A protein has these predicted regions:
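Auxiliary tRNA-acceptor-end handling modules of aminoacyl-tRNA synthetases
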Residues: 31-51
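Short terminal hydrophobic/aromatic SLiMs and anchors at protein ends
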Residues: 5-8, 439
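Positively charged, Gly/Ser-enriched RNA/tRNA-binding surfaces
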Residues: 32, 53-68, 79-82, 103-104, ...
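Polyanion/phosphate-binding surface patch
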Residues: 42, 73, 77-107
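Short, conserved phosphate-binding/catalytic loop or strand-edge motifs used
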Residues: 151-157, 193-201
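Acidic, His- and aromatic-enriched active-site or binding-groove loops in soluble protein domains
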Residues: 94-103, 208-230, 318
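Short hydrophobic alpha-helical segments enriched in small aliphatic residues
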Residues: 5, 16-18
């Protein structure tokens, strides 16, 4: 080997060896052997800015659930296929990620949180108390075609009440839906409600009850594919004349008609008054008593495509973003646990589409794209010390502020950039002590000057980063300024 060429060790994942001549490096293996970093189609990574916004949304709705007496649970991502698919239709099975594990068991990833919840109730029935009100926020998977706003992996946010079949539990779920949207700052929305029982009675009069599941799934597409396409698909299984009548049931009256007018219309089509229409009237009266009925409309076209719904059903739309689709939907399912236990347990619940709702909140300007957890960051200014910065941050934390300290004295523009990327609006500069008076260099323990009780009088500069405006004050006055300056 030539004296001016030296063989050096290297990283085996990159190359077997490298030859160095002066400052040039030549690798003996191609870099194309590196694995390309990418996610599966229909799946996503979430950067901190995205995950923070989602975490804040989850925190808000979780507080609403807890305040209404709902408790958290969790279930496995994988279930036996027979547990998930026993009550499903062929369309659902096509969307399920299903496979045999190493032990030859037929298993599948959960496609929603309701079916696993029914299994959970049956398996732990003796350990639970009823009515049992739970919330569950977790990922689900569906193998549908990826498109804008639709993914194969996404988070569902479910809340249900089981063990009581009465108008109040139906109302309670609707009230929580209303409260969650209000807590998120949404004011312009409508919750569309209907009842599967009324629609099934109507189909029975048309002698189509044995085809109800197929018809329900087609009618459920009305808002997506339009009246003409729905009539065309219905005609294939019900005939043209009956297809027209079915669509007329769902859209025969103006959406501006009042609740009782629409209810009387579908009640007549279904053959008269019955427990299902009585339930709708009772629920609506409870909504009126609570002073929230103005955000609810009776919409017979709402059917929900899933098989297990048997009673009241509902979907929620943001009035200013109708193209977004439903952001919260659900209904009553009286027969779901009957698949897993002899005694059936009646239940009612809803699911919030977190990702879709978050996208809508961003479009409406309700959620900032620069949302962050931290109230303020302590910048490391030349001439100061990390000990004074750390002590000041500890003082603010004891005052209830969420504070971060920049760890090293980099250029101030770099520190600004760091804060802005994390969505931090406020920056804090701790004024250095006069030259010769700083005891930070003392080697033995924490000096008296840094005791937390003495930090309150530290002179500081508080900077509002979006506007670059700056205020001189004492550290003890910072908490009030941060709280008063929050947008």
């Amino acid at each position: 080997m030539c004296s001016h060429v030296k063989r050096i060790p290297c990283f085996p994942r990159l190359c077997k060896c490298a030859l160095v001549t002066g400052i040039k490096i030549r690798y003996t293996e191609k870099m194309s052997e590196l694995i390309q970093p990418k996610v599966l189609k229909g799946f996503r990574d979430f950067l901190p800015c995205d995950e923070i916004r989602r975490a804040l949304l989850i925190e808000t709705v979780t507080n609403v659930f807890r305040n209404a007496g709902f408790v958290p649970i969790d279930t496995p991502a994988l279930e036996y296929s027979e547990v998930l698919l026993r009550k499903s239709n062929g369309e659902t099975e096509k969307q399920v990620f299903r496979f045999n594990d190493n032990g030859g068991r037929d298993i599948a990833l959960r496609f929603d949180l309701t079916v696993p919840f029914a299994r959970f109730i049956a398996e732990h029935y003796s350990e639970l108390y009823f009515p049992f009100k739970r919330y569950h926020i977790a990922k689900v998977w569906r193998g549908e075609k990826p498109q804008a706003g639709r993914y194969r992996e996404f988070i569902q946010c479910d809340f249900d009440s089981v063990g009581s079949d009465c108008a109040y539990t139906d109302f309670e779920i609707l009230k929580v839906m209303y409260s969650a949207l209000k807590a998120l700052g949404v004011t312009n929305f409508r919750i569309h409600i209907s009842h599967r029982g009324v629609f099934n009675r109507f189909l029975d009069r048309l002698e189509l009850k044995n085809k109800s599941e197929d018809i329900l799934r087609i009618v459920d597409k009305l808002a997506k594919i339009g009246k003409e396409s729905v009539i065309e698909q219905l005609a294939e299984i019900a005939g043209a004349e009956k297809a027209e009548k079915i669509v007329q049931y769902g859209s025969g009256l103006s959406a501006d008609s009042d609740f009782e007018t629409i209810l009387a219309h579908i009640e007549a089509l279904a053959g008269g008054a019955a427990p299902d229409t009585a339930r709708l009237r009772e629920v609506y009266q409870l909504l009126c008593d609570a002073g929230i009925a103005g955000n609810f409309v009776l919409d017979p076209s709402i059917t929900r495509g899933l098989d297990y719904y048997t009673g009241i059903v509902y979907e929620t739309f943001l009035t200013d973003l109708p193209q977004l689709g439903s952001v919260c939907s659900g209904g009553r399912y009286d027969n779901l646990t009957g698949l897993y236990m002899k005694d059936t347990v009646s239940g009612v619940g809803a699911s919030i589409g977190l990702d879709r709702l978050l996208a809508g909140l961003e479009q409406l300007g309700i959620v900032s794209k620069e949302a962050g957890f931290i109230d303020a960051i302590v910048f490391y200014e030349k001439g100061n010390s990390i000990r004074r910065n750390s002590a000041a941050a500890s003082y603010l934390e004891q005052c209830g502020c969420r504070v971060e300290v920049f760890p090293e004295p980099k250029k101030i523009q770099q520190q600004y950039g760091y804060a802005e990327k994390k969505g931090i609006d406020w920056g804090l500069f701790i004024e250095p002590l006069p030259e010769g008076s700083d005891s930070n260099s003392e080697p033995d323990g924490v000096s008296v000057s840094l005791a937390l009780q003495n930090c309150a009088e530290m002179p500081v500069r508080l900077k509002h980063l979006p506007s670059r405006t700056e205020t001189h004050l004492l550290l003890k006055d910072v908490p009030a300024s941060l709280k008063g300056g929050k947008k």
